[in-house]
A protein has these predicted regions:
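ER/Golgi luminal nucleotide-sugar-dependent glycosyltransferases, focusing on the catalytic module
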Residues: 1-176
Length: 176
């Protein structure tokens, strides 16, 4: 997997029409040059996602309500997530490190937008699918994984990809 670099851009609070989707993509993708109108289809917009960040990385987190972290800590089946942790630890140690941080409440979610060149999106997607397949292959069929739990797993996977294989060049993390 290639190692990428990226930049994080803080949006102004008074975002208005000038941040239409096209301008949005141009703004967050300056590290690969301006996107011409005809190149719009070369990029994938994730829309609104919620990757996870280390709680103490940014002072702004201090003002976030505790219930954001508490949701992650309290609202999951301990045995099920222990099982998921065991699968990750044996097959994907890097992801397991991020997983442990989430389960310990050291990581919280923050909404952001993400634009990625299609080629890199394919790499992320294929990696993500392979990890999910490993997880689902290790969880017994009679242990259902809820939508909320899958959301947490997906956030952990995206975060791990961003930390380990990102900070994704030719696409940028856009903190809002």
């Amino acid at each position: 997997m290639k190692k990428f670099t990226a930049k994080t851009i803080k949006l102004p609070k008074d975002v208005d029409e000038k941040y239409s989707q096209m301008n949005y993509l141009k703004e967050i993708s300056k590290n690969i040059g301006d996107i011409k109108d005809g190149e719009k289809d070369d990029f994938v917009m994730f829309g609104h996602i919620e990757p996870l960040y280390l709680k103490n990385c940014i002072k702004h987190f201090e003002s976030l309500p505790e219930n954001i972290t508490n949701f992650i800590i309290k609202n999951y089946d301990v045995n099920k997530f222990n099982l998921i942790g065991q699968i990750l630890q044996s097959k994907h140690p890097m992801i397991f490190q991020t997983f442990t941080q989430v389960m310990n409440g050291n990581i919280i979610s923050l909404g952001c937008e993400f634009a990625l060149h299609k080629k890199l999106f394919e790499e992320y997607y294929n990696w993500h699918v392979s990890v999910i397949a490993d997880l689902m292959g290790g969880i017994p069929a009679d242990v259902p994984v809820t939508k909320e739990e899958m959301t947490i797993i997906n956030d952990i996977l995206f975060t791990t990809y961003w930390i380990c294989y990102g900070n994704v060049n030719k696409g940028s993390i856009f903190v809002v």
